[in-house]
Amino acid sequence: MRTVAARPARVRRLALWGAVSGALFGVAAFAPAAWLGAAVRAASAGHLLLTDASGSVWRGQARLTLTGGAGSRDVLTLPGRLGWRVSFSGAAVVLTLEQPCCLAQPLRVRLEPGFGRWALELLPAPGGIGQWPADWLAALGTPWNTLQLSGAVRLATPGLRLEQVQGRWRLDGALTADFDQMASRVSTLPRLGSYRVTLRGSGAGAETAAVSLSTSAGPLLLAGDGQWGGARLRFRGEARAAEGSEAALQNLLNLLGRRDGARAILSIG
């Protein structure tokens, strides 16, 4: 009699478990795109927003907006819409991004979760990642909204992998940002120059990555080096005016950093 009585109870438990599992699967399968927007807002501390989102977490689109953070009035939205698609490759999640205005080709990002670790990999983009208007940076607030830059920012990578294991960071590969034909409302010069910022992993299990700043061309000469380790950036550099451009760049040099004679000291961290 106990065995017969136990069977209905077991069946009820299995049915309940099945109903709960089905409900959870249904919620996950049809999770609205707004949920992804909330996650992006939290992860970026309110600097990057997915607005006017439609579709689902797995396949959707939204407008990409940059802000100075919570309470900031500096807001700028890129033209067009950012589309995304989520797929799986073994235990990894692959995110494919498309944006006609700015991405040169579909961008693929691979996320590998694990116990006490995770890895984020930016897959190689032979033709470059994309190009964005430099005035978009003004939405980040100070000092960008003061500099009011114009020009183009191009990103490229041969492949980049960021990994965190039990709180320790490691970066392999490289990411290059080219700031082409920069101009600023703070200066009377039509062009400040073109610059390159490179982030390069140290490899061999190192917990820091090298950061470098160099000038490709132009009257404003920028140079510097630093290290990035997870959430912390340490950078030291300098800004100078090329011969003949000193008077036109004085105000800008004063804004960029502490003056030391003809140069301005750049310091972060």
Show which residues each predicted segment covers.
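Amphipathic hydrophobic-ligand
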Residues: S72-G83, C102-R110, L137-L160, L189-V197, ...
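Alpha-helical transmembrane signal-anchor/signal-peptide segments
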Residues: A33-D52
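N-terminal beta-strand/beta-hairpin edge segment
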Residues: L48-T146
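Short helix-loop boundary/capping segments
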Residues: R161-E207
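Short, hydrophobic/aromatic-rich segments at coil-to-beta transitions
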Residues: W58-Q61, S89-T96, D172-T176, A204-S212
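Hydrophobic membrane-insertion alpha-helices, especially the h-region
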Residues: A9-P32
